[in-house]
Amino acid sequence: GGLKATFVADYMHTIIIFVTILTFVTAVYVNTDITGGIEGMYDKLVQAAEIRPIEGNAAGAFLTMASAGGLMFGIINIVGNFGTVFVDQAYWQRAIAAKPSSTVKGFLLGGLCWFAIPFTLATTMGLTAVALDVDITMQQAQMGLVVPAAATALMGELGAILVLTMLFMAVTSAGSAELIAVSSIVTYDLYRTYKNPNASGKQLVKVSRATIVAFGLGMGGLAVVLLSM
């Protein structure tokens, strides 16, 4: 249990996510029945750019790194994620628990592993949605439904199941880390420091478990509220 359990869960869930992503890559660029493989995708994306060019992209193309919108998103993402890394207790717990000789290597490798997920999904499912002209509204796209829509168009019901599995793995992995992070702050930094300095091990465990339940319900309730807005 505890932090060790989150490490194991993160590792296993990441494996499942990567296997799912590799399945999508194979379906898009290897199996040529629907997309036409690499050449078919290229032709479809060039044709799509001629029909509806992207404002801010070089020549309005989809296959370009020269994108004003992409640059703006990158700046916002990098600046915004500084807060995620330096303020999130989950990162600090991992840094403190790891050996000093392994911390830098671990975080660099973790960053590369994370980068592979959005980059590969964008270059497979994102481009597939454009190439196959998936019927999706702007509102649905802003809600993050491009990937499931593209997966369904590409692989049918199996694609939707794979996306759901991948999403479940990501949410539970991140959720378990945050539960442990919040419970440790409440238990040791607040309860034992200010409320009960002489708390026994059983009392600390009780507070930790109560915090996990309360924070878990709070996250679920907040998710429902945000979905209904």
Residue ranges and their predicted role:
Residues G1-M229:
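Membrane-embedded helix-loop-helix hairpins and adjacent transmembrane boundary segments
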